[in-house]
Structures are given as C-alpha cells and as structure tokens.
Regions:
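Polysaccharide-binding surfaces and accessory modules of carbohydrate-active proteins
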Residues: 5, 10-21, 30-264, 280, ...
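Conserved, mostly hydrophobic/aromatic
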Residues: 18, 165, 289, 335, ...
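Glycine-rich, aromatic-flanked loop segments that form ligand/cofactor-binding clefts
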Residues: 70-115, 243-257, 300-325, 362-367, ...
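Short Pro-Gly-centered flexible turn/kink motifs
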Residues: 100-106, 284-303, 720-728
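Carbohydrate-binding surface patches
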Residues: 243, 644-687
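Aromatic-lined carbohydrate-binding/catalytic grooves of carbohydrate-active enzymes
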Residues: 326-463, 476
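Active-site neighborhood of glycoside hydrolase catalytic domains
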Residues: 393-395, 429, 433-590, 602, ...
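C-terminal beta-sandwich/jelly-roll accessory domains of carbohydrate-active enzymes
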Residues: 671-731
Length: 731
C-alpha cells in the first residue's frame, strides 16, 4: 500500500517510489501539512512545527488561552477564508446571510484501491500496468452543513501524487462559492525559486525563474483558456537546483480554462504554494444537494533535479492522460497546406501537394482552414460546417477518396467553438454566441465565441463534425480555437449562474470532445489554439498531440520546445518543417536544421513541396527516413535537456532508449562569432557499464566515460546549422 495511516487515523503518509507526502489532523481537527520531499519513513513529523505568538495572529476558540496556536501561522492543507488565516486562502464561501467564512475541520477518511475520476473533467486513469490508490479525507465546515472532500491520488512508480477537491452543500440554504483551488500546501524551512512558462501568441512557454519571497509570485489566465501567456504548470525548486541536482516540486493542472498558480513566503518564512481555477469572474451557486468539483493537479517531486522531474511528468502524461487509438500507435508524418496556400486553394492545388508529398514518403495530407461555407478569408463562415463543393470541385468524400487512393491518410481542420457574424449559423441563431445584452461584443480575428455551455450548441457541432468525418472517412482532425473568451453571457443561464460560465464553457468543450471521440474512436485528434494557446494536460486527455506554436521558425522553436519539455512528453509536441524565409520571423535557416528541430516532436511539413529544390526534396526523404528510424526514441525514450536557461551559443538535447541501447543527440548552433570556439556538450543517460559507438567518428567509449567527459565537435557549425549524433551500444 502506498497510503499509510497511523493507528489513531490522524497521520497520513503517502509513499511513492522516491518521495513522501505527510499530513496530520491535530487535536483541534485542523489538517496540517508536514512534509513533501525525498522518501522517508512513517514517523510523525508534527514536531517540525514550531508554534509561537507572532502578534496580531488570531487564535481559534479551541486554543483557549494558548496564544501560540494560530491558523495564521500553521502549515495547512486546506486554508479557509475569514477565520483568522490572513494568507491567501484555498476556498471562499459566501453564506445566505451575506457572511463569508470557511473553516474546515477533519472528520474522517477512506482509502480506495484505484485512482479517482472527476465528473465531466479529465484526470489520471488506471492502466493494466499500474493502478493508482486514493485517499479521501472528509472535512466538515465548522458552523454550517458544508462538506469538503479532499482527494489524494498516488501513482507509486511514477512518483506522482494528485490533488483535487469536492465541495458539497448539505445545508438548507444556498451558498455562493467564490473561490476553490485544487490544492494548497505550506512548505516549511526552505528557500524556493519558481520556474514558470510565459509567452504570447507565436512565442509560447519561455522558461523564467525567480526567487519566492514575501511578495507573491503569481501567474495565471483569465482568457477562458490556459492561454499562450502562461502555462498551467510550475516548478518550485530549491535555490540553485539544476538539471541533475536539487529538490524540485512540480505542479501541473489538468485543466484548459482560467487558472492561477502562486507561491509566497509568510511571516514565518513558510512558502504557501497553490494552484487551481482563477477566482476572477468565478462564482458557483450551490443549492442544497449540489456540489462542485475542482480540476485535478498533478504533483511530482524530484530530489535529483529538473531532468528527473520532467521525465516523471512525461511518463505520467503519456501513460495516464493520453488516450485513444494513437496513445502508442505510430502517428503518420503529415503535410499541412496552411502555409503553402492559406485560403487560396482548390482541389487541384491540394492534390498536387499531396502527390508530391506521397512521392517523398509523407503519409497524410491535412486540409486546413477554408474548405467550408463562405470562407475565403477569416472574416466569415465559421459555424457553417458544410463543404464548399464549388471551391472543392465536389464533395469532401470525393477529395478524401483521391487522397486515400494515393496511399495517404487525410485530415481536416475545424474550429468548432467559434462563430462568424457573417455566417448562416449566426443569422439563424445569434443567441448562440457569447454577447452581453446591451453591449457590442468584442471581436478577435473578426469572430465570436459560441456558448459551449448550451446542449443545443454542442448537439449541432457533434452532428456536423461526425457527419463530415464519417462521410469522408477522415483519419485526423485538427481542432483549433483562435481567440480568447470574453463578453461571457448565456441566454440559457439564470442570472445567479453567470459566474459559472467560464468553467461551464470548459466543461462543455470537454463534453463535446468526449462524445466526438466516442463516435470516431479511430481518429487522430490534434489540438490547437492559435498554436500553443491551449497546450495543457487537460487537452492532452483528448488529443495526444497539440500544435505547439503557430511559429514554425526553427530557432524560435528551440525556446518554445525547450519550455514545453519541462512537463509535456515530446510525443505531444506538434512540430513541422516550414519554408524560408520563415512566414513568422523572416529568418532563413538551413533545411536540415528545420528538420532536426521538428524531429523533436510529432513530425510534419508546412509547405508546398512542389516549390522546393531537388536537393531539398532529397533532404525531405532523409528526414522522413530519420523520423521512422528514431520514432521510438523520440516518442517513448527518456528526454534530456543538455543546455539550459543561461545564454549559450548552441542548444542541445538528447533522447535515450529506455533500455539504454542507443541515444540520439542533436545540436543547433544559435549564434556565431569570429574565431569560433568548439562546441562541447554533455552526454547523459547512457548505461555506465555498456560500450557505445559515436556516429561522428566511430569512437567507442563506455557509457560512464561519455556521461562524464561529454562530446566535442571537431567541425565548425555555422550559425543556425545543426548536427545529429547517434550513440549505439556495442555488444
């Protein structure tokens, strides 16, 4: 059993292979956080807490004359609001009398021999290879009939602990839930730094690192999606922690909507670490008998640096989040027509692109935006999911049949959650779009957002999408979402329910995705939101790969894919070779480099292959062959970042087979200067006692030597040039 409980039922120790998490219900039934870190025994660590009178720290009634006991200074698992803890709370409730107070005390516990599910939301699931365990702790509100259930999931082998919570109103009167996070924990006696991932459209997930001090460090999104601007995954690490050393705690939210993640030192230098749904524009009305569930947060600990932490997240997301026919099945190498044609295409152009792609070994053609309704630009047509047969010279089934006869798969782009005002759908159902009565709604990309909280909207979309997919025998769908969500108002919701709409929007999207995939179980679904605007574990539950960024510039992609790698498996990274000069940056990079960067992901092309040179066509063949050669390495192997946050003149990364029989190391020169110095890089992950041959010069060394001495290139890489180096076990 990974969940250990003391004889008196008040000390809880969660054990994974390499980590321990401990909490304790004290004699006043306050649930205290004691420890999360390197694996230890089951001894009670409550002695680590030092209570002292800090002044102006309130004392609950149970403390009696003891001024040292205060919720304002204790390390808690579930800090409430309005009852004496003045730090950031985890939960805020407004009662029927207008008061706001949340003071939850320990009541009971239950242990389940399986992982827990969350109604209507994605969460880690059990497999035949590993089942999780669950601890459910029931808390009761001190002065009302409100019950809080805390869920702790343990995946022992992957060193993962999950957190989620469920609030149930058992009282006679309604309450307003104004804030409820997925987890809070108070960490004692350490100085931490936070690593988070910021960005913007076409430049997502830039890794940044700052110390956690008494001023709060907070990131989040109120855009209706997890967003390009911050990712719902952060790391707390000890000062100076690196790839192979130092304690690190990761937190990844399995959610695709508004979120917040924060860390702050308190007056005792304890660090309060929290994550969950953002409280801005959030208010859930709960009548008697109603409940609210938070999204799941995935926690993981590494005592040996960031690399191990990332590998633990890669494994848990790949094996216990990603699902469906393509969870492990080999995914086709694709070509997408978007940057080749934009909206200016017809059947003839698409078939010519497909014919050339097929000759070069590419396995699937994806037809992007512009095939439906009145859609010659981005100003009209969204919502009218009917094939423009005039533009396509026939039905989609006819085009798909021609592609299939070439021996290729065929994919199609959709943007189901959006609607254009210039569309038949909007003219028939203007109330289906989010818009506040009496206000002109904001436009973004000249489109509005459909009210995904409505069942009739989802039914329409499900019918349209499944009909097209089935009729044309579509193999792949790219599911896009090209704006942020605002002007939120539903004609189907009561006024006291409008604070629920941002969350119910996400639940509506999840519901549609679940039903769509159930109707099309063999489909490969790739997520997208203007690239990486919804690149999160919630969407990976439905789409095992996500278009990582609309920026296809190979050099910018180094930073984007570097940041993505801290939490998300390389198999989830949609990455393509595109034309040069690049359409986003104007940069010119070697064709080989573009391929090497795209190989660190779910590989494809974004160009008209009829317009490239014969030499480049040969490179396409080589890259396609390389993708097949290295597929198992890049999609299932262990990933190592060999260069870091500090500025260097090259970037390097490595994949190592799980059996350590081979490895692939890639180097890209990012900067050049006169009289250049040689490139020397680390090598990681090779078996200490095995011998490996290097593909550069045939030199054979032990894994121990390669791991410690590294590799020096004896050739000068010019700016933006790249090289792949393979290490193969010698029997």
């Amino acid at each position: 059993m990974a969940i250990k409980v003391s004889e008196n039922g008040r000390l809880f120790t969660l054990q994974t292979k390499d980590s321990s998490y401990q909490m304790f219900a004290d004699d006043k039934n306050v649930l205290l956080h004691l420890y999360y870190g390197e694996k230890i025994g089951e001894e009670n660590l409550s002695g680590l807490i030092f209570c002292t009178d800090m002044g102006f720290a309130g004392n609950p009634e149970e403390a009696g004359p003891n001024r040292k006991y205060s919720l304002d200074t204790l390390p808690q698992e579930i800090p409430g609001s309005g009852v004496g803890d003045f730090r950031d709370d985890m939960i805020e409730i407004r009662h029927a009398d207008g008061s706001f107070a949340a003071d939850f005390r320990f009541d009971s516990f239950e242990i389940l021999d399986h992982s827990y599910a969350i109604p209507g939301m994605p969460a880690l699931y059990d497999t035949e290879e590993e089942k999780g365990e669950t601890l459910v702790i029931t808390m009761t509100e001190k002065a009302s009939d409100i019950v809080l259930k805390l869920f702790y999931g343990v995946f022992e082998k992957e060193n993962v602990i999950t957190r989620a919570a469920r609030l149930e109103n058992h009282g006679e009167t309604a309450i307003e839930l104004e804030k409820m996070l997925s987890f809070s924990m108070d960490l004692m006696y350490e100085n931490y730094e936070m690593i988070y991932f910021s960005g913007r459209h076409a430049m997502e997930r830039t890794a940044e690192r700052i110390p956690v001090q008494h001023a709060k460090v907070e990131i989040g999104s109120t855009r209706g999606t997890s967003s390009h601007h911050y990712n719902p995954a952060v790391i707390l690490c000890e000062e100076g922690a690196g790839e192979t050393h130092g304690s690190c705690i990761g937190a990844c939210l399995v959610y695709s909507g508004n979120f917040v993640a924060a860390a702050q030192k308190d007056q005792k230098n304890q660090t309060r670490f929290q994550m969950g749904i953002h409280p801005t524009n959030f208010c859930f009305h709960l009548e008697k008998g109603e409940a609210f569930d938070t999204p799941q947060a995935i926690l993981s600990y590494s005592g040996t640096g960031l690399t191990k932490l990332s590998q633990q997240y890669h494994e848990i997301i790949r094996e216990h989040i990603c699902r469906g026919a393509y969870k492990h099945a080999k995914r086709p190498i694709l070509i997408n027509n978007w940057e080749a044609t934009y909206f200016n295409f017809n059947e003839e152009k698409i078939l010519k692109i497909a014919e050339q792609a097929q000759k070069l070994g590419i396995e699937m053609l994806v037809l992007d935006d512009g095939w439906f309704g009145k859609r010659e630009d981005d100003n009209s047509g969204l919502g009218d999911w009917f094939v423009n047969e005039k533009k396509m010279n026939g039905s989609m089934a006819q085009l798909a049949e021609k592609i299939h006869k070439m021996g290729m798969k065929f994919g199609l782009w959709f943007e189901p959650e959006m609607i254009s005002e210039d569309s038949d759908l909007y003219r028939a159902h203007p109330d289906w779009a989010f818009a506040i009565p009496g206000r002109v709604p904001n436009h973004s990309r000249n489109q509005l957002v459909l009210d995904m909280t409505r069942e009739d909207v989802r039914e329409y979309l499900l019918e349209r999408l499944t009909t097209i997919v089935h009729d044309a025998k579509i193999d792949y769908v790219k599911w896009d979402m090209n704006r942020s969500v605002c002007d939120v108002y539903s004609h189907m919701a009561a006024q006291n329910r409008n604070g629920e709409l941002y969350h119910r929007y996400v639940l509506g999207v999840y519901d549609l995705l679940e039903r769509f995939l159930a109707a099309c179980p063999d489909l490969l679904l790739e997520g997208c939101s203007g690239g990486g605007g919804r690149y999160d574990a919630g969407m990976m539950y439905y789409s095992p790969q996500i278009w990582c960024s609309d920026n296809t510039d190979a050099i910018n992609r180094l930073s984007i894919q570097y940041g993505s790698s801290f939490f998300y498996p390389i198999s989830t990274v949609g990455s393509h070779v595109s034309v040069c000069p690049n359409h986003q940056t104007g940069r010119v990079t070697p064709f080989r480099t573009r391929g090497d960067v795209a190989l660190a992901g779910s590989f494809g092309y974004e160009m008209d292959l009829n317009k490239i040179s014969d030499e480049e066509k040969e490179m396409v063949k080589e890259q396609v062959a390389a993708m097949h050669t290295y597929y198992d390495l890049t999609h299932e192997g262990l990933y190592y970042r060999l260069t870091g946050l500090k500025k260097q003149d090259f970037m390097a990364w490595e994949f190592v087979a799980k059996d350590q029989s081979r490895a692939l190391l890639t180097i890209v020169k990012t900067d050049a200067e006169g009289n250049m110095l040689p490139v020397h890089t680390k090598v990681c992950g090779l078996a200490e006692n095995k011998l490996y041959r290097c593909s550069l010069d045939g030199e054979i060394r032990s894994g121990r030597t390669w791991n410690r001495a590294g590799l020096t290139l004896h050739q000068v890489l010019k700016e933006y040039e790249s090289i792949r180096v393979e290490f193969t076990e010698v029997e």
